[in-house]
Each structure stands twice: as C-alpha cells, then as structure tokens.
Amino acid sequence: DGNAEYFEIHKASYFDSDTQTISLGNGYACEANFSQEMPEWNLNSKKTREEFTKIAKFWIDRGVDGFRLDACKYFTNKETDGTEFLKWFYDTCKGIKEDVYMVGENWTDDSDIQELYKSGIDSQFAFKFSTSTGTIISNIISQGGMATAKKIMNYDNKMTESNPNAINAMFLSNHDQVRSGNALESQ
C-alpha cells in the first residue's frame, strides 16, 4: 500500500529472538516492542522524517510550546541510532520554533539516559527517583532530605556531562505508575 517504508518491516529472521514483532505473513514481520497494535516507526526513512516534520510544524504553528516524547528507548534498534534521531528531531523542531521544549520518557538505566542527552534534548524524566519506592518519596517518609539532595545533585551532575543545558525532569509519579498520594496517605 506504499506505507511499508514508514515502519520497521523486514524478513522475520532479521529480528533478534527477544524483539517483539507482528507477523505479516510470507516470512515478513514488523517490529512492535511497545504493543502489538503499535508498530515501530522506521526512523531512518526520509518519508517518516518528512511526516514527523509536518506533524511538529502543524502543532507548533497552533501554539504548542513543546513535546513529550513517549518511550524514547525504542528510538534505538538494529539500524537506528536513537541519539542521532532525537538530535535530528530536536534540531528540526528548534528550526521551526527556537524556544521549543522537549522532554523524553525513558524507562531505562542512567547510561542510556545519558546517551540520549547527547542529542541536546532539554529534559528526560528521572524515573529512578519516582514511585512510592523511589528516592524522593522514600526519603520524604524517612526524613532523609540531605540524602535526597545529594542523590539528585549527583544524578544532575552525571546527566549534564552529556548535555550541559539539560533540565532533569524530576517527578513523583505519572499515568503509568501508582499515584504518589497512595504512598503518602498513610504517613
């Protein structure tokens, strides 16, 4: 139908055994790490990037000041350098609106987050500090304010090594997690 170039479609044997895919028949599959209903974009495709540019421009022209990018860790696969793509998209949006703000959701370890900060992106959510068992709430409950401050400062220093302008996005919880109020209500 002419849309195959937009997605990560390959011979099924191309994918690693732990990669989630959607079988397309005739020996082909489409990468779908997040959900069987959500195929992965081919982020190396010129057509895909043209569409991303049009979509960003559409929303920026209507007054949107920034973007929250869901599941950034899936921007990287066998043939896609997630940092390169993120840099391209960030620079593209900055070309449309100089002061656009971009925050990435990246449920992964510090080294992956640090790598994506090399793209220049403004912020990434600091998941290790969130949830009822994360650093912030745990230390609020135990009254460990100084320990929390030191952990956040060390994290911030580590991330700004990759991007001196990084604004780490600390938060307590989001729509994918148990709400922070549940952890604090008994305190």
How would you name each of these model-derived features?
Residues 1-4, 54-57, 65-168, 185:
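Active-site-proximal helices and loops of the catalytic beta/alpha 8
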Residues 1-62, 89-95, 112-113, 131-135:
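Substrate-binding/active-site clefts of carbohydrate-active enzymes
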Residues 39-42, 72-77, 178-187:
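Active-site rim elements
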Residues 172:
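Conserved N-terminal catalytic/coupling substructures associated with nucleotide/phosphate chemistry
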